[in-house]
């Protein structure tokens, strides 16, 4: 079944410019709906780790993108005094008390998750936003005004602090999802975008911005890398001088590395102190 879905989605993607809500073929509609439903239940993911490496299911991402071409905007009532107008329903629109109990997570008003996102057990959603295709694994905290972008992958026991932005793949369109691995702490108002991977047990300080073009400077080695924070890194914002010394440009600085045991025993503020 999965292989058949993949074939339909890949073919539809090649012809996507021809589709609209009025003319999309039934088999394409059904295939996209099945993919979104499986994403919503967590039985299918845009990306998963295989033998230590992240594998992106590009066809699943394509299904998410196709869904926007296949649906019209509809009115979505919310209580007696508010309504919305969008293509994607909210995840919890038809939830009962039993559904919430089965899910095992908390949703604090006015947190919003879109249909097609997955929220794991013991997750706490403060007033925040989780977009379609995103996966938030068990025990994670999505703090107030944090946003988890489309198809982003959030690991177990991750803390996304207030105002954190985790980039999506839709606007602007990205090749790969942004990934935050298990046991990471992302400090307030930080932004991790453009398919950057933050590996497990890392701590990102407040106000750190990392995209694919951001230089990541390792203080211990002097090495500059891009797009990936190594496991156990403690990262703060910084600057690197230009070659002529006339100006400096923003970078992210790995100030130290910690193992999982140290990370578990040491407070976040203590780790960030130089």
Curated annotation (Swiss-Prot):
GO terms for biological process: diaminopimelate biosynthetic process; lysine biosynthetic process via diaminopimelate. Substrate binds at residues 106, 143. It comes from the Bacteria. InterPro entries: DapD_Trfase_Hexpep_rpt_fam, Hexapep, Hexapep_transf_CS, THP_succinylTrfase_dom1, THP_succinylTrfase_N_sf, Trimer_LpxA-like_sf. Its EC number is 2.3.1.117. Keywords: Acyltransferase, Amino-acid biosynthesis, Cytoplasm, Diaminopimelate biosynthesis, Lysine biosynthesis, Repeat, Transferase. Pfam families: Hexapep_2, THDPS_N_2. It is an enzyme of class 2 (transferase). GO terms for cellular component: cytoplasm. Homotrimer. HAMAP family: DapD. This is 2,3,4,5-tetrahydropyridine-2,6-dicarboxylate N-succinyltransferase. It comes from Janthinobacterium sp. (strain Marseille) (Minibacterium massiliensis). The gene is dapD.
């Amino acid at each position: 079944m999965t292989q058949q879905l993949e074939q339909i989605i890949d073919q539809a993607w090649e012809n996507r410019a021809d589709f609209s809500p009025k003319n999309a073929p039934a088999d394409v509609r059904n295939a996209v709906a099945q993919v979104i439903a499986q994403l919503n239940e967590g039985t299918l993911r845009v990306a998963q780790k295989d033998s230590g490496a992240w594998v992106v299911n590009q066809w699943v991402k394509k299904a998410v993108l196709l869904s926007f071409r296949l649906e019209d905007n509809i009115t979505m009532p919310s209580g007696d005094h508010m309504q919305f107008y969008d293509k994607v329903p909210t995840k919890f629109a038809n939830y009962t008390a039993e559904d919430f109990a089965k899910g095992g997570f908390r949703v604090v008003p006015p947190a919003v998750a879109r249909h097609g996102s997955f929220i794991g057990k013991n997750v706490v959603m403060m007033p925040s936003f989780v977009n379609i295709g995103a996966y938030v694994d068990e025990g994670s905290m999505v703090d107030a005004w944090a946003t988890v972008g489309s198809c982003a992958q959030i690991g177990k026991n991750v803390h996304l602090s207030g105002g954190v932005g985790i980039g999506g793949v839709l606007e602007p369109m990205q090749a790969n999802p942004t990934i935050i691995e298990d046991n990471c702490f992302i400090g307030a108002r930080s932004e991790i975008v453009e398919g950057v991977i933050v590996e497990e047990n890392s701590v990102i300080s407040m106000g750190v911005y990392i995209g694919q073009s951001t230089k990541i400077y390792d203080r211990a080695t002097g090495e500059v890398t891009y797009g990936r924070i190594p496991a156990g890194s403690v990262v703060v914002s910084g600057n690197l001088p230009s070659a002529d010394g006339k100006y400096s440009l923003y970078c992210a600085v790995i100030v130290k590395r910690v193992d999982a045991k140290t990370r578990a025993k040491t407070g976040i503020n203590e780790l960030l102190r130089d």
